[in-house]
Regions:
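Basic, flexible Lys/Arg- and Gly-enriched helix-loop patches that mediate nucleic-acid binding at interfaces
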Residues: 1-243
């Protein structure tokens, strides 16, 4: 199955935590690739971590995933990544070049495709730096989540944080929002935004020990949590993609 050891799976079955196609799993059951498995109601996406592939948590300083053929005054991200998987890397839901923060980078195309879908079912947290303070009516308008193109973003929270000189930081939590969407929510209220940083995707948080431009390997547990969001969230994402 690629998501647990045999002993762990047997423990889940005995505890009645694992279902196959809506039915409680029993010891000795055979599971095919088209069967739907859920653990505690949470859909299990059976993606195996592939040996030799690279799975990274990257603290983006605000840049595109450039190749060596695209000159830049800064060292390209691809030049800093591990060489063993070649030079083909994919950034999942990349932050705009002028912003930065948490990004997921992988050389595994199959995983990248799954993550592109599931990240829209997960709540993400952003820190937004603006000039001056935002009024309470503007905060309420941001919470409504209306975007320029007429779409509506599900904003779960928006609150003021600290400040530095004339700038103020705001923390916003939204489901499936991109860095561009978050910036747009604030600019629609007349805010002058100088920085948008993504600090969390689902349960994966930005590692503050990482300097800008650095990365660390993702653990298997972190990957599993990203590709297997809670059942209710996955169902919501499916509904959005079917519209």
């Amino acid at each position: 199955m690629g998501v647990a050891s045999r002993r762990e799976a047997e423990d889940w079955i005995r505890a009645g935590r694992l279902t196959v196609n809506g039915e409680l799993a029993v010891l000795g059951s055979r599971v095919g690739r088209t069967d739907h498995l859920r653990l505690d109601g949470r859909l299990i996406h059976r993606h195996e971590v592939v040996a030799g592939q690279v799975y990274l948590c990257h603290r983006s300083p605000g840049e595109n995933l450039r190749t060596p053929e695209e000159p830049s005054e800064h060292q390209a991200l691809v030049d800093r990544l591990p060489r063993r998987a070649g030079n083909r890397f994919i950034t999942v839901s990349p932050m705009p070049r002028i912003d930065g923060g948490l990004e997921i980078v992988t050389s595994d195309g199959g995983l990248a495709m799954q993550l592109q879908r599931t990240v829209h079912a997960l709540s993400s947290e952003f820190s937004v730096r603006v000039l001056g303070e935002i009024s309470e009516p503007s905060i309420q308008a941001i919470l409504e989540g209306m975007l320029d193109r007429g779409e509506k973003l599900q904003v779960e929270n928006c609150e003021a944080g600290g400040g530095e000189a004339a700038n103020r930081w705001y923390t916003i939590v939204a489901r499936g929002g991109s860095g561009k969407d978050i910036r747009q929510l604030f600019e629609r209220q007349g805010a002058v935004v100088s920085r948008v940083l993504r600090t969390r995707v689902g349960t994966l948080t930005l590692d503050r020990a990482l300097s800008r431009g650095q990365f660390r390997p993702l653990t298997k547990e972190e990957i599993d949590a990203l590709i297997s969001p809670p059942a209710a969230d996955a169902a919501e994402a499916d509904a959005e993609h079917s519209e």
